[in-house]
Amino acid sequence: TGNYATRELETFYIWNTATDLATFKQGLQFFDFGSQNWGYADVLGNIAYFASGEFPIREDLDAGTLHGNPPYLVRDGTGGNEWKPLGGPQPADQAVPYEVVPFAQVPQIENPAAHWWVNANNDPIGNTADNDPLDEALAGTGPYLSPGYDEFRAARITELIKSELNLIPTPPGTPPGDGVISMADMERMQADVNQMEGKRLAPYFVGAVDRAGLGGAPAALSSLLNPTIIDARNRLASWTYNAPAGFDTPGDPGTPTAQELVDSVATTIYNVAVGRLMNRTFDARLAAEGIGYRQGTTEGVRGLIRVLSRVPFTG
């Protein structure tokens, strides 16, 4: 929140002498400026994840309603959606003089049954997966944390780990797993170039071309069908969603494989197509309304996924 005095130095003072998970959690109570993701591991084999920070509870969200604009837009300051005042004495380790989501309800996990966990600035509880961060409930409080996260990165890491451990079928463009994760596997994951957003959006372009060749397709769509478009469609359909970077260890890319060439061309087609689609939808509408603002790539991709998942895509 950043509006009140905090005691982060107390956190690190406690951690400097911590010998177990309980003491680590004790120190975490004083890290209140902003919100961070923390990983924990000790010599006894314990692992844990914690989100830190204080999350004030909004009056309207706590009541299960939304009063006016959502909290990620400018809100009406005349009442009805303020931070809830404290219902009792302010805890000694709390910086914000308002009711906050209890620490036990802040995203965290200790010694998960899977023996691993993933975090990459993603939504730690999944409330934004349906493009609505306000429609869940958490023990009577509005569980709102943020309107958006870097979701594809953590999704790909999770997919890679599950694939390497043979928990899921090997995804396209991913080496088969052997049931264990080595240091070499971790290095490969770190250098992964798979484009998860392409996996979500490219099929819409493929489907649009397929529908263009069917009877009854809109004239504006069927008139665009030509050998070049069909070739682009086939390249997208053959894409493993990898975007080859052209560099390899120790710096010599060598001769690209046939699949890498296919993926490189498909990556180019996809990125140009998505950029043009954003330009002709969101950008065009904003310009028509006289709005100079243009959404960033993250917001644009999120918007496309939201719209295309709800409205039939005709191209």
Per-range role (PLM):
Residues 1, 22-25, 100-101:
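Short secondary-structure boundary micro-motifs
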